[in-house]
């Protein structure tokens, strides 16, 4: 939340990586759609960077029965949302890395029969490549005010960085792969594709080599489960034991190198 620094960034600021100095870092995330006993990982870019954007649209208030007397910020907002998606579908080379622009909140309006003066949109940008992120940011900054102007309104956009790309150090992954296979069994250690979720563990990885993997939490005998951040999310706690063992053995093997 705004005004709070929680998580990895604050821990780093307070010196968690110093005294003693940290040489490497390991982390895991439970996954409700991976079977208990299975570990999934990816070398290199694993989880997306996250940015938060706010778009403010200014129109001119008028009665809903006389739209020609005003400038409709809700209509402009709809056009902006539509335009933003073309950045992803028509301008971003998705065969290289995935990218997402999502408007998650729209606030506007005073009454059902009034065209309001303003609208606000808040959303997120997810990328796995910083050059791609820079391009998407630039196009959003160009497109938002231009679309508003085309409909006789005004719009501003601010983009704030959230988390960095969760990047698994390839050498560290190679070093730790035998450890994971020994603990979980080679057949239970599986590669996966990058995902567009974000993780502040990435801030640690900007400072020291890191390895972040996913631990199975789907109950044995289950073929489907609900994803994270849904009302029916559920994991099997028995899967946590493998996570403890894996992190312990990783630490011991790394220190013994």
Model-based region annotation:
Residues 1-116, 198-199:
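Histidine/acidic-residue-rich, glycine-tolerant segments that coordinate divalent metal ions
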Residues 78-257:
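Metal-dependent amide/peptide-bond hydrolase catalytic core
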